[in-house]
From Swiss-Prot:
The keyword Transmembrane applies. The lineage of its organism: Bacteria, Bacillati, Bacillota, Bacilli, Bacillales. It comes from the Bacteria. GO terms for cellular component: plasma membrane. The keyword Transport applies. One of its GO terms (molecular function) is sodium:proton antiporter activity. Its main location: membrane. This is Na(+)/H(+) antiporter subunit F1. May form a heterooligomeric complex that consists of seven subunits: mnhA1, mnhB1, mnhC1, mnhD1, mnhE1, mnhF1 and mnhG1. Mnh complex is a Na(+)/H(+) antiporter involved in Na(+) excretion.
Length: 97
């Protein structure tokens, strides 16, 4: 069996699963569900870029995969802090002179 057909089928499956995660982001019901769905969409986007890189036969898209992973991690960390504290950046005015 041709590997290109398998790659295209894998791309379609990951794209369809991304649509399911998009529905979870829109519907919710809670903020935690939306955060987990966005994180899963980041991982699925990394998989799509990796499969597309294999399909094209190039290794130069690996930097994009790393950047997507870093941004997904930072986004999840920021949302977790927002859910915990209610704000992302805390200002402590007592330390200023």
């Amino acid at each position: 069996m041709n590997y290109n057909i398998i790659l295209v089928i894998a791309l379609v499956i990951v794209a369809l699963s991304m649509l399911g995660m998009l529905a979870r982001v829109i519907i919710g019901p809670s903020l935690a569900d939306r955060v987990v769905a966005l994180d899963a969409m980041g991982i699925q986007l990394m998989a799509i870029v990796a499969l597309f890189s294999i399909f094209l036969g190039t290794k130069y898209m690996m930097v994009a995969i790393l950047l997507i992973g870093i941004l997904a991690f930072l986004g999840t960390a920021v949302f977790a802090k927002y859910m915990d504290k209610g704000k992302v950046i805390e200002h402590d005015n007592n330390d200023r002179h």
